Amino acid sequence: MIYSRSRLPSEGEILIATVKQVFDYGSYITLDEYGGLQAFLPWSEVSSKWVKNIRDVLKENRKVVVKVIRVDRRKGTVDVSLKKVTDDERRKKNLQWKKIQRLDKILELVSQQLKLSEKDAWEQVAWKLEAKYGDPISAIERAVKEGEKILIDAGVPEIWIKPLLEEAAKHTEEKKVKMSGLITVKTSEPLGVQKIKEVMSKALENIEQDYESILNVKIYTIGAPRYRVDVVGTNPKDASEALNQIISNLIKIGKEENVDISVVKK
């Protein structure tokens, strides 16, 4: 379980959340980095474009990246926005989230070895490394390569150091796999370039959240009308499934937007 130093997030924070309940007027979500704290996503903050049905955008149990827009510390309530998160913020958060998950897994295993709680691990290891270096998992990776002084300098208690380094060494080197597909994209619509960009952006939504092992996805031209779809991850099965899902999304959304998309090679 992931523990935060603060009970409530701050306005402007970008967070990973899980959709729990979807209503006509909005959605209740839980903030994964704040112990499952409930937050409210108003309908007006779901999309910057008109959406006929909120369930076309939000699905229960799906991970989403949100921005905190209001915090009432007296009542303990939090409101968030989906539409205010930029593509760059979403990409960076997904990469950070994968690091946080790796950190959490390492701390869980080490705390079990030491017969201590996961909260102890976060307080005595993660928070100390964060205070000293900013990014706990990067600090642990440095310690694996450079030695225990990295941990000692941050004030990590001695009891954690040896088992932490041993466990972290098993998790720091992940082999990457890359899956690619070729497609052709054509449209006779006015503002066709913008329309194609919108279709591609929609097709990539939630892919990195739905597949935890996926590190990066992108679609780029190799000479119009040909485009390449690249999926990079650490699990070949997930990478293949994600690629198929993206191409399926492209074809489906393309039909809805009068953009003709066909597969050249997968």
Curated annotation (Swiss-Prot):
The keyword Protein biosynthesis appears for this protein: yes
Boundaries of every S1 motif domain copy: 12-83
Kindly give the Gene3D superfamilies that the UniProt entry links to this protein.
EIF_2_alpha, Nucleic acid-binding proteins, Translation initiation factor 2, subunit 1, domain 2
Name of the protein described by the UniProt record:
Translation initiation factor 2 subunit alpha
Q: How does it assemble?
A: Heterotrimer composed of an alpha, a beta and a gamma chain.
Native organism is: Saccharolobus islandicus (strain L.S.2.15 / Lassen #1)
Gene Ontology molecular function terms on file? ribosome binding; RNA binding; translation initiation factor activity
Q: Which gene encodes it?
A: eif2a
Which Pfam families does the annotation name? EIF_2_alpha, S1
Q: Does the keyword Protein biosynthesis apply?
A: yes
Q: Which UniProt keywords apply?
A: Initiation factor, Protein biosynthesis, RNA-binding
